[in-house]
Amino acid sequence: MSNQHTLLSSNLLPVGSNISTWWNFGSMLLACLALQTSTGFFLAIHYTANINLAFSSVTHILRDVPYGWAMQNLHAIGASMFFICIYTHIARGLYYGLYLNKEVWLSGTVLLMLLMATAFFGYVLPWGQMSFWAATVITNLLTAIPYLGTTLTTWFWGGFSINDPTLTRFFALHFLLPFIIISLSTIHIILLHNEGSNNPLGTNPDIDKIPFHPYHSYKDILMITLMITLLFTIMSFSPNLFNDPENFTKANPLITPQHIKPEWYFLFAYGILRSIPNKLGGTLALLMSIIILTTAPFTHTSYTRPMTFRPLTQVLFWTFITTFITITWTATKPVEPPFVLISQVASTVYFFFFIINPILGWTENKIMMSTN
């Protein structure tokens, strides 16, 4: 038995001994993915993708299906938890220079785009007021594409407005995309384990490695347990914490909500979109707010990998995080002064992070060289 245990331990993936709690969010994301897939499957059994029945079918799930309320709330709150984890995961990658593992970073960026698409399609499915109008506003951005825009939008909608065919295809895509995400997540993990995890100091992890189990696996289990505890606490005491009050009303194309906005986890991108008065410019800025992450591995100029020992870049990083929160906040506000100006300034600072970061890295190199 002892020999078997030794054999098992020697085959487990060795990991750097000093990786911190920030490295636990990957496993938390896997737990979120498993939760969303399982609860989503049970919801899909009872859901009806028809504009006349969709809203009623969600009400039926909440009222009549045994534990349907738990499934629906877990799925809705789980989506928010998913994005909290993924934004933390990305911030950790930016702070500790993990983007230098190019294949992992680029596959992760593709995963983020797929996740955002999946969440958007899912938000439309209950066919509430905000679902309908958010879908109308966002899909209408396709018309900004020169020459092909109107044709693409009509093809995407399945008609000349958002209607029954749109809801049907959104449901089909919302059901299909998670399986693509699972496949890509597997590739993401394989690519990570090809090189191995980095650490907070940015030193060579081969110097001091320990088996993943039990040292890091128990840490993963602890963080997943805390996340699930928080998830169930919100579900039990404040299930509608992340819901929009407008979405408790059935979609009505004749009544426009006073302030159209998507779910909170899209507000930073929506805020950037709104800050530019031109439709095509706003659409490009919206896309670039995600795509710009792919530039990080190619613009790294510092001799040191993480920001742990780079005070100037740390100030820039926390300015970037504050900017992200500011854009999210302004996107919840109406399009009027002073929110428009705040949003425009914050959006500019958001993109400036990716321009100033390599310049600061080069400056810090010069300072280090001069002190030596």
Curated annotation (Swiss-Prot):
It is found in: Mitochondrion inner membrane. Keywords: Electron transport, Heme, Iron, Membrane, Metal-binding, Mitochondrion, Mitochondrion inner membrane, Respiratory chain, Transmembrane, Transmembrane helix, Transport, Ubiquinone. One of its GO terms (molecular function) is ubiquinol-cytochrome-c reductase activity. CDD domains: cytochrome_b_C, Cytochrome_b_N. Its cofactor is heme b. Disulfide bonds: none annotated. Heme b b562 binds at residues 75, 174. It is a multi-pass membrane protein. A ubiquinone binds at residue 193. Belongs to the cytochrome b family. This is Cytochrome b. The gene is MT-CYB.
